[in-house]
């Protein structure tokens, strides 16, 4: 066999291997999307209620109470991989909490019917004979060393303190953000004391959504759109894009509604 034929056969084999490897890679990356295809739980998500004024949209939240969201299609696989890595870090801490016997509840999803609010606290821990909310966050080492606190995590813990108090009827006034440095595994504890003033804007949002929900039930009138059209940057990543603009899969009612 000539050297040219050998080279061609070798190249063909390498091409086939490359194609096969690409097919396997695509199939594995599809797993990140498939893992989210069943995430259609009913209710408002705490993270959406805590969004900034620029990102928060009443129309999106009211739609989410009646129609299915298309979130799996909106998040890029790269972002889903980051989420998966974060989940692995959370599991590390959950296992440690369980081994130490300080776990009261780990990732228990709760529902406030009054507000259609679904929320999941990372961990409720028994520390020094007191129930404390813990929210686990990861940071790159640069941010970890530069920041003293964790503003988004602190806001989240404060909201959970309010929500858990509403749910149980038992005051919960203390929590902390557990910040885990991605690169060197250093940790930081950011204490959070409940602030009624800080949580009020988000409680007001929940109340307003309930008013808008009843308006939609009675008149079928939705809040105004935040986005000018379905191709804006915000709309392209919106969980309720299809239902809002009645495109794609359109408005598919939730099974619970």
Annotate each PLM feature.
Residues 1-133, 145-146:
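Metal-dependent nuclease catalytic cores that hydrolyze phosphodiester bonds in DNA/RNA
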Residues 7-12, 16, 163-257:
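Metal-dependent nuclease catalytic regions and adjoining charged, substrate-binding loops involved
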Residues 31, 63, 141, 159, ...:
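General helical structural elements
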Residues 50, 116, 153, 230-231:
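A broadly tuned, weak detector of single residues within folded domains
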Residues 53, 64-66, 137, 180, ...:
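Structured loops at beta-to-helix junctions and adjacent beta-edge loops in soluble globular domains
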Residues 57, 160, 238:
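A residue-level signal for conserved active-site and pocket-lining positions in enzyme catalytic cores
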Residues 106-214:
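Mg2+/Mn2+-dependent nuclease catalytic core
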């Amino acid at each position: 066999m000539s050297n040219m034929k050998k080279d061609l056969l070798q190249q063909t084999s390498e091409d086939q291997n490359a194609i096969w490897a690409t097919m396997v890679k695509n199939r594995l990356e599809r797993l990140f999307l498939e893992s989210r295809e069943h995430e259609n739980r009913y209710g408002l998500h705490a993270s959406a209620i805590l969004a900034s004024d620029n990102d928060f949209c009443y129309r999106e939240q009211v739609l989410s109470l009646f129609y299915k969201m298309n979130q799996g299609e909106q998040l890029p696989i790269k972002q889903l991989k980051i989420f998966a890595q974060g989940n692995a870090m959370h599991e590390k801490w959950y296992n440690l909490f369980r081994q130490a016997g300080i776990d009261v509840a780990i990732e228990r999803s709760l529902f406030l019917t009054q507000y259609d609010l679904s929320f999941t606290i990372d961990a409720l821990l028994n520390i020094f004979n007191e129930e404390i909310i813990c929210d686990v966050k990861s940071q790159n080492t640069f941010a970890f060393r530069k920041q003293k606190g964790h503003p988004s995590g602190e806001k989240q813990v404060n909201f959970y303190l309010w929500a858990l108090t509403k749910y149980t009827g038992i005051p919960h006034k203390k929590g902390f953000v557990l910040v885990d440095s991605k690169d060197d595994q250093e940790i930081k504890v950011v204490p959070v004391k409940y602030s009624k003033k800080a949580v009020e804007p988000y409680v007001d949002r929940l109340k307003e959504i309930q008013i808008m929900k009843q308006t939609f039930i009675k008149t079928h009138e939705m809040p105004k759109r935040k986005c000018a059209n379905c191709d804006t940057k915000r709309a392209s990543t919106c969980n309720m894009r299809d239902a809002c603009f009645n495109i794609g899969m359109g408005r598919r009612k939730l099974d619970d509604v």
